Amino acid sequence: MVQKNEHQGGQSQHSLFAAGPTGEERRRVQWLTAELERHNHLYHTLDRPEISDDQFDALFRELQDLETRWPELRSLHSPTLRVGGGLLEGLAKKAHSLQMYGLDNVFSAGQWQEFAERMARAWGGDVNGPLPESFWCDPKLDGLALEIIYADGVLQEALTRGDGEVGEVVTDAVRTIRTVPLRLAGPGPFPARLEVRGEVVMYKNDFAVLNEKQEALGLKTFANPRNAAAGTLRQLDTAIIGSRPLRFLAYSLGQALWTPAPVCLLQSEVMSRLREYGFLTPPDGRLCSSVAEVEEYAQWVREHRAAFPMEIDGAVAKLDNLEAQQALGFTARAPRFAVAFKFPAELAQTLLKDIEIQVGRTGVLTPVAMLEPVSVGGVMVSRATLHNEDEIRNRDVRVGDTVMVRRAGDVIPEVVGPVLEKRPENAREYVFPHTCPACGQPAYREEGEAAWRCENMACSAIRLRAITHFVSKAGLDIAGVGQKWIEQLVTSGRVQSPADLFTLTVQELLGFERMGEVLAHKFVDALARAVHSATLPRLISALGIRHVGEQTARTLALHFETLDELENAGAETLLSLPDVGPEVASSIHNFFNSPANREQLERFRALGLWPRGGRSGGGSSGSTGEGGLASGPLAGKNILFTGTLSMPRSEAEKLAETAGATPLGGVSKKLDYLVAGEKAGSKLEKAQALGVTVLTEEEFMTMLREAKAASE
């Protein structure tokens, strides 16, 4: 935080009239130092913040003011002299070759003007001439700071910022991030050593999808995209890291030994070079030619904040001239040539009218706050998640409270906490139900889990969610069979399980509201096509087995030829597979031991919905019927798509599946073909390094035609 420290005459007010700090001021500095260190640890190390950025900044400014007034109160471990938090013990540690500093903050146009004036004074215009007033500006990303080190264009090492001087080694994790070049793009020559600094983020839409998957699998959801990105990067299991949609956006350099590459003299040149080398950079960065233009840019970013694909919490301005940057240097914690415009958090106050329970497809009971509608970040919000019973208790949220609401990641509305000074006398503590609100059956909470679950798998709410999941993109992906139709069919009693869908007739559908003859025929045809085109991985995913998502379903389909084989697999066999742990193996065992599930599987078999996978390589029901192609160049092969294609990637994967191939989620030694479209990145490089056959989209289409011809 930047404050104007000078007073008229250049002397502190207190140096003239006070002998020293009061006892109260001493105690306040000690408390602020300890409290800020605690919050630093919670935020940077544990990713479990207890206060908002605005609250932290207010405490930080107060400590800075006191230390400026009484320098003798500043301790060697003051938070104003360091950046970030401590280090996790589970990761190796290494010193940065050059310290990774934080940024001082400004919160108004006046504070920005003061900062610019201080830069000019530090530059010494009388000796060095006027300070170059061009600034490179871009959005301030809210993620995890990272340094990636390249030697002669090849990725060597990656470190988190840590405490600024020593970071955590996360090289293997970073290699799984698709936006990180394993080898710099372009013909070269490349710098002998290049330390690329930037931020690991998760886009808001990706974050929403991840949390939906976590919730569907009964796993812990993340509070916001930053926590999701930080928690993922610190995972020790690279398979989990690689399955999550992290992105690295580069915005500066540490040490740069340019020879034999051309030298960059300006920050704007650095950004262009980073893009040439294959990095993503923060969107809408621009060169501003004056102090006033920088202020206009920061205001523009603030006004368009909601439109950015990732969370941002400000804008950054830094001198464009790198020589001037070097001349100005650093304070103990921040550069003198750069500053962050911090924006206030997007929060709103509203009335919590009630709390309702939503039942998920695996039976999870999720509390949902029913709110007086309020605009948060430009979006009207009337419902917000409260996550689970523990969160309600920990945040002391009561029905009738005025609560603070934010859009977590600018996507999912959540209740932050109550406004205690506005709490009415009749505010009611919420008692979490121990029975399911949909069916009235007992709920249970497993040891070590935060979620309560309905134990009645015949529950109407679970049934509705399960059938909706079965036809969704995470299941069989049956176009035209959406949730609204499922709700009507389930409510009517005609559809009580996924198998019932495939027995619907046009005549029956015509009896439903807004279902015309053309739509009814399309509905039935889509279900009929799904029987023949379904693949084993999609069917396994569609079944909704707890803890079994799309990637695990693919793994199972690679190792088992039919659902019969999967049902009969022993625990030892299951646990030998890469994505299967004790919980997953137990869930699979429990699913197939359920009489209701076994009955449904027999109905699928009778309908012809019984695809083959594993060693047969056919992948689809049609390998014994019309749709699948059990022979040809793609049969039994593992395939992956990367880059920009002429068709949606999901459509390309479907075509591959009908030709007998199995789409994978990442590059590995098991991959047979990589189909590379335009702007293919790190996947292409990794595949080439492993000797995987790389195809163009046209070559892939040729193989599809050959597969079709072989089946005729």
Swiss-Prot record:
Q: Which residues cross the membrane?
A: none
Residues involved in NAD(+) binding:
53-57, 138, 161, 199, 318, 342
Q: What is catalyzed by this enzyme?
A: NAD(+) + (deoxyribonucleotide)n-3'-hydroxyl + 5'-phospho-(deoxyribonucleotide)m = (deoxyribonucleotide)n+m + AMP + beta-nicotinamide D-nucleotide
Protein name from the UniProt record: DNA ligase
Organism in which the protein naturally occurs: Desulfovibrio desulfuricans (strain ATCC 27774 / DSM 6949 / MB)
Q: Which InterPro entries match?
A: BRCT_dom, BRCT_dom_sf, DisA/LigA_HHH, DNA_ligase, DNA_ligase_CS, DNAligase_adenylation, DNAligase_N, Hlx-hairpin-Hlx_DNA-bd_motif
Keywords associated with the record:
DNA damage, DNA repair, DNA replication, Ligase, Magnesium, Manganese, Metal-binding, NAD, Zinc
**Cofactor(s) needed by this chain:** Mg(2+); Mn(2+)
Chain sites annotated for binding Zn(2+):
436, 439, 454, 459
Q: Does the keyword Lipid metabolism apply?
A: no
- Biased-composition ranges for Gly residues? 614-630
CDD domains this protein is in? BRCT_DNA_ligase_like (cd17748), LIGANc (cd00114)
Instruction: Give positions of region: Disordered.
Output: 1-22, 612-631
Q: Where is the BRCT domain?
A: 629-712
Question: Which Gene3D superfamilies does this chain map to?
Answer: 5' to 3' exonuclease, C-terminal subdomain, 6.20.10.30, BRCT domain, DNA ligase/mRNA capping enzyme, Helix hairpin bin, Nucleic acid-binding proteins
Which family is this sequence assigned to? Answer: Belongs to the NAD-dependent DNA ligase family. LigA subfamily.
Q: What does this protein do?
A: DNA ligase that catalyzes the formation of phosphodiester linkages between 5'-phosphoryl and 3'-hydroxyl groups in double-stranded DNA using NAD as a coenzyme and as the energy source for the reaction. It is essential for DNA replication and repair of damaged DNA.
This entry's Gene Ontology molecular function terms read:
DNA binding; DNA ligase (NAD+) activity; metal ion binding
Upper taxonomic classification of the species?
Bacteria, Pseudomonadati, Thermodesulfobacteriota, Desulfovibrionia, Desulfovibrionales
Signal sequence annotation:
none
